A protein has these predicted regions:
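Glycine- and other small-residue-rich loops at beta-strand/loop junctions that grip anionic moieties
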Residues: 97
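A domain-level signal for the structural core that forms small-molecule/cofactor-binding pockets
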Residues: 126
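Active-site core segments that coordinate phosphate-bearing ligands/cofactors
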Residues: 1-91, 100-122, 130-140
Length: 141
């Protein structure tokens, strides 16, 4: 999402507003190798979507597809994790900058079937600091 945001030259808040205006919800595999470092992320995503059906017609459609695809991927990963370790959770905690994206959090709740709890953006730094403070001097994690 950051690559597309930079390519478009708009804020994340503007991206959310564009996504809300779109009804295009096609999903692509966000973990596909082709998305690791393409020359043009927008073009690569559009090409991937065109290969499996209809490509997004607008930037709003592209952004909405990205959000749906990320949330779908989170759902797949969460279900796989639950299966692998034999545990079930009702909540998914989101920390860091992404926690501010209410639209992505709503989609994540939809695709995971979990309650999404958005932690304050500072939670990532606080958790990191807590871990570092618990390591004895000269020790390792």
């Amino acid at each position: 999402i950051q690559c597309v945001q930079k390519q478009l030259g708009i804020s994340f808040a503007e991206m959310v507003e564009l996504a809300k205006a779109s009804t295009y919800t096609r999903i692509f595999d966000v973990n596909a190798a082709r998305f690791s470092a393409p020359q043009d992320m927008r073009a690569e995503i559009k090409a991937a979507l065109a290969e499996t059906g209809e490509a997004p017609a607008t930037d709003a459609d592209l952004i909405n597809s990205i959000y749906h695809s990320l949330a779908y991927c989170y759902g797949e990963a969460f279900r796989e994790l639950e299966t692998l370790i034999g545990q079930h959770w009702d909540k998914l905690y989101i920390a860091g900058g992404g926690a501010k994206n209410a639209t992505l959090n709503e989609l994540t709740a939809h695709y995971t079937g979990k309650q999404v709890v958005a932690l304050p953006i500072e939670a990532t730094a606080i958790g990191n600091l807590k871990i570092q403070m618990s390591i004895p001097e000269g020790g390792t994690v």
